[in-house]
């Protein structure tokens, strides 16, 4: 058994990528909120007038901004999937070199082939893709923006009141109350999708590059150890479903982590690490 997880560097890199994605996506929406704040400064907070032309123009501009954010998010997540996959493969190369196998090469074609299983949705055996999911999240946000404006006009709210509600909606630090009829945080769907894609890219690359290694006998499920670990992940770490030990799964039976997951995995092998490096 190896003393240390040979894929620890890739695991740490995955965390860096997820954190970077989170900051970037959140900034997209903060920048949009700043634009609305500028608009609010031009409005009379004491006026009860509802300017439909102004509100429809504001709605149009925000919807265009959401399209831009969608494109940017798609690029960020795609890049995160690719680089995380490559890091796993590089760790595997180091691992194989350490046990005497030097013919393993990490080519751009190999990285793309593995990453595409996640990006195109082949991993999920359904009519799904990263692009369609991100655009779907963007459309839901646009629907919410349109709903805020339409409901405000219907309820005879002032232009300022409606714009203020839009400001609250696009503020990633604010969660609108349930009675508003709109679910927040506004960036939640994009954040959840981004984290899930990188996590699944990490897991898929980990399995693909080790499943045919005869020295790797099984996989071990390891939770993040954080306070918010869900019951399902705790069960996966503690259960001995296959009689191999707690949290240990045959190579063809490692469960795919759930959306927004943060668990990791280790290889199980009887290979003597000390002998390998002293040979």
Locate the predicted segments by residue.
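N-terminal leader/targeting and assembly helices and adjacent pre-domain segments
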Residues: 1-178, 271-279
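Acidic, glycine-rich two-metal-ion catalytic cores of nucleic acid-processing enzymes
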Residues: 181-279
């Amino acid at each position: 058994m190896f003393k240390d997880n040979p894929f620890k560097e890739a695991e740490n890199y995955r965390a860096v990528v997820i954190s970077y994605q989170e900051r970037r996506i959140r900034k997209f929406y903060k920048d949009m909120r700043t634009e609305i704040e500028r608009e609010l400064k031009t409005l009379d907070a004491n006026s009860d007038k509802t300017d439909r032309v102004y509100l429809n123009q504001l709605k149009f501009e925000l919807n265009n901004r959401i399209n831009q954010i969608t494109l940017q998010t798609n690029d960020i997540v795609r890049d995160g999937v690719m680089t995380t996959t490559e890091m796993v493969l590089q760790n595997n190369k180091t691992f194989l070199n350490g046990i005497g196998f030097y013919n393993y090469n990490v080519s751009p074609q190999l990285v793309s082939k593995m990453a595409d299983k996640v990006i195109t949705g082949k991993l999920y055996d359904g009519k799904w893709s990263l692009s369609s999911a991100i655009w779907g999240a963007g459309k839901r946000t646009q629907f919410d923006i349109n709903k805020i404006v339409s409901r405000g006009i219907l309820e005879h709210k002032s232009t300022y009141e409606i714009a203020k509600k839009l400001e609250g909606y696009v503020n990633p630090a604010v969660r609108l109350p349930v009675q508003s009829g709109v679910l927040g945080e506004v960036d939640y769907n994009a954040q959840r999708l981004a984290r899930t894609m990188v996590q699944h890219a990490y897991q898929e690359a980990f399995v693909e590059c080790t499943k045919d290694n005869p020295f790797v006998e099984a996989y071990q499920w390891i939770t993040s150890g954080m306070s918010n670990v869900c019951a399902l992940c705790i069960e996966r770490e503690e259960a001995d479903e296959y009689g191999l030990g707690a949290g240990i799964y045959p190579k063809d039976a490692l469960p795919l982590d759930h959306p927004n997951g943060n668990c990791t995995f280790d290889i199980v092998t009887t290979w003597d690490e000390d002998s390998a490096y002293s040979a």
